[in-house]
Amino acid sequence: MSGDHLHNDSQIEADFRLNDSHKHKDKHKDREHRHKEHKKDKDKDREKSKHSNSEHKDSEKKHKEKEKTKHKDGSSDKHKDKHKDRDKEKRKEEKIRAAGDAKIKKEKENGFSSPPRIKDEPEDDGYFAPPKEDIKPLKRPRDEDDADYKPKKIKTEDIKKEKKRKLEEEEDGKLKKPKNKDKDKKVAEPDNKKKKAKKEEEQKWKWWEEERYPEGIKWKFLEHKGPVFAPPYEPLPEGVKFYYDGKVMKLSPKAEEVATFFAKMLDHEYTTKEIFRKNFFKDWRKEMTNDEKNTITNLSKCDFTQMSQYFKAQSEARKQMSKEEKLKIKEENEKLLKEYGFCVMDNHRERIANFKIEPPGLFRGRGNHPKMGMLKRRIMPEDIIINCSKDAKVPSPPPGHKWKEVRHDNKVTWLVSWTENIQGSIKYIMLNPSSRIKGEKDWQKYETARRLKKCVDKIRNQYREDWKSKEMKVRQRAVALYFIDKLALRAGNEKEEGETADTVGCCSLRVEHINLHPELDGQEYVVEFDFPGKDSIRYYNKVPVEKRVFKNLQLFMENKQPEDDLFDRLNTGILNKHLQDLMEGLTAKVFRTYNASITLQQQLKELTAPDENVPAKILSYNRANRAVAILCNHQRAPPKTFEKSMMNLQSKIDAKKDQLADARKDLKSAKADAKVMKDAKTKKVVESKKKAVQRLEEQLMKLEVQATDREENKQIALGTSKLNYLDPRITVAWCKKWGVPIEKIYNKTQREKFAWAIDMTDEDYEF
């Protein structure tokens, strides 16, 4: 029985393949014949179609009965399938003729939908497929046998095509997905940036819009992680030797560490200064063992060359690091910043300015400091005082150590403090300049200076009257106050001899620091100042003064030696007390702030031209800023690369001039062509050349403005006055009034520092 079934199945399959080959050969001929006979047989085909539909309904009934019978019997009749396969071709031809060109619409009206049509593909046997526009889709109506008979081949082809279609769609989907992802990324990136910017904007603490704390209270809650200590000393490699008197000498770890501090500075001018060398050697010997002290008795016999070369090589290696190595270091620093660089103050995350404690090294000081070269010792946890709120988590000290003290003082702004060993001064870890505490302090400073504006005329009248006082102390105070007001001099603090550099302020002026000229350069009553100011920067100025001031100075200098104090009956304490009596909160610094800010405002009004472009306006701003820096004696040494950078800038200017000359020639030539041709095309060319010339002129102007700006400010430090003495609201108002982007005046850090001023100021602000 099973053998018969196998025989029947193989016979059916063979017949099927034979019929299938006949079908492909006759396919195109049948189509052509149908196309020709289409019009003649139209009515006949419709009748056949109707007849076919009625037959289809009958076949469906028969099919249902057969299906019921099959389910009851539990098997299918394979012999009947064999006869049906033999008659396949005949039925196929009848079905195609019956279908004809019957419309889909009509088929649906007859109560059934057409089965899926078989895709016709051109064969490789030399036949040409008829034009698509001439062929109407064929619908295969079902006859009485078609309901229960479907050739295996057709079914297999349909399934394969369906699978192929799905696979193609999936592949297309996979190919398209990256594009969609890229598009999504491109769309998402700006959205993410906007969201991030919006989130940052929301996170910014607009403390200036909140109610201020009671007087003296700085915060209500403060929590932080404490300081980051300098890494421990790493001994030098065995190959790096120290020589004393031409012989190799192995140093103890402590002595070696201090020796490396000197070796790192070997090429610096500091190591040639006698005071530096003397202080270093004295402190270095304190770190030596007894044997080392007995051996090393002369610094000149010490050879630090190999140490110095080793550190230079280390420095060069850091410069030559790969991107991956630099990125790794950057990530480590960012991780450290994230953990230690922020604190929580009154439920807001605030940036800490200097969370790393300075490593040990050699003290340099400002100017010719008498303690330069001394050893700055390593700061340990036992030196540290922590300040935080009582309900905050106290930062943990490094393992095996403890803090010197933990305080909960909300009347101070520092987080960590310690005492350094050189000057005995207290050092602090404070918040970033963009923090609320620093911002409030700045705001108060400028508001105090604005209050001075209301009473400055009264104060000036007062000190003018005091020039005539019978008391020498009052006269000296009045002249000193005149200098502080007119010249923006610092008050000058009293200093212990030998403890700090010999810098001078108003109250500490000596007779040797001034020269009096009844007439100089066509001006009367000129005072010539020449003294070391803050950071040992020389203050040199020739100033015409009022006659009574000049006469008083002559009086103050009578019978005095050059090293004697000019104001021998005055000190900073007496002066500051007098200033407080004149106005609450008034100090010499308030006078400097007032004069600096008012000078900037006046200079901007004088120098800014409404019709200037943005680069020219920026030059005007820098010139106004320069006037303030000169007033406050904010000088600097010209940068080492100044000459080279100016040469590079001049080369750019020369190249731009050549480009402009060529562009002007092109414009002239285009205008000549336009006169001859007189057509729209040449007119467009002329306009294009004009725009090119204008663009190059603007670029040249920018470069020339930049060169002028650099030259004028090569020895002037604009940043000091901009950050510390100029009310930022003056700058913000000027930018808003004249359409100058604030980014052109303040960098990102400065914008964060002055966020309060940028937010609250409009263009009508007056200091």
UniProtKB/Swiss-Prot annotation:
Keywords on record: Acetylation, Biological rhythms, DNA-binding, Isomerase, Isopeptide bond, Nucleus, Phosphoprotein, Topoisomerase, Ubl conjugation
* Region spans: Interaction with DNA: 427-428, 490-495, 587-589
Where would I find the Glycyl lysine isopeptide (Lys-Gly) (interchain with G-Cter in SUMO1) crosslink on this chain? 119
Q: After translation, how is this protein modified?
A: Sumoylated. Lys-119 is the main site of sumoylation. Sumoylation plays a role in partitioning TOP1 between nucleoli and nucleoplasm. Levels are dramatically increased on camptothecin (CPT) treatment. Phosphorylation at Ser-508 by CK2 increases binding to supercoiled DNA and sensitivity to camptothecin.
Boundaries of each Topo IB-type catalytic domain copy?
434-767
Q: Which residues carry this modification: N-acetylserine?
A: 2
N6-acetyllysine modification sites are: 174, 282
Q: Which residue intervals are annotated with compositional bias (Basic residues) in the record?
A: 24-39
Q: Name one GO cellular component term.
A: nuclear chromosome
**Which EC number(s) does UniProt give?**
5.6.2.1
Molecular function in Gene Ontology: ATP binding; chromatin binding; chromatin DNA binding; DNA binding; DNA binding, bending; DNA topoisomerase type I (single strand cut, ATP-independent) activity; double-stranded DNA binding; protein domain specific binding
Which InterPro entries does this entry report, sorted A to Z? DNA_brk_join_enz, DNA_topo_DNA_db_N_dom1, DNA_topo_DNA_db_N_dom2, TopoI, TopoI_C_dom, TopoI_cat_a-hlx-sub_euk, TopoI_cat_a/b-sub_euk, TopoI_cat_euk
List, in alphabetical order, the GO biological process terms annotated in this UniProt record. animal organ regeneration; cellular response to luteinizing hormone stimulus; chromatin remodeling; chromosome segregation; circadian regulation of gene expression; circadian rhythm; DNA replication; DNA topological change
Where's the active site on this chain? 725
Q: Does the keyword Acetylation apply?
A: yes
Catalytic reaction list: ATP-independent breakage of single-stranded DNA, followed by passage and rejoining
Cross-link Glycyl lysine isopeptide (Lys-Gly) (interchain with G-Cter in SUMO2), where in sequence: 103, 105, 119, 136, 150, 155, 160, 166, 174, 206, 338, 551, 644, 702, 714
Q: Where is the composition biased (Basic and acidic residues)?
A: 1-23, 40-110, 131-168, 181-200
Instruction: Reproduce the miscellaneous comment text.
Output: Eukaryotic topoisomerase I and II can relax both negative and positive supercoils, whereas prokaryotic enzymes relax only negative supercoils.
Which family does the record claim for this protein?
A: Belongs to the type IB topoisomerase family.
Q: What does this protein do?
A: Releases the supercoiling and torsional tension of DNA introduced during the DNA replication and transcription by transiently cleaving and rejoining one strand of the DNA duplex. Introduces a single-strand break via transesterification at a target site in duplex DNA. The scissile phosphodiester is attacked by the catalytic tyrosine of the enzyme, resulting in the formation of a DNA-(3'-phosphotyrosyl)-enzyme intermediate and the expulsion of a 5'-OH DNA strand. The free DNA strand then rotates around the intact phosphodiester bond on the opposing strand, thus removing DNA supercoils.
Subunit and interaction comment: Monomer. Interacts with ERCC6. Interacts with TPRN; TPRN interacts with a number of DNA damage response proteins, is recruited to sites of DNA damage and may play a role in DNA damage repair.
- What is the name of this protein? DNA topoisomerase 1
Gene name, Swiss-Prot/TrEMBL? Top1
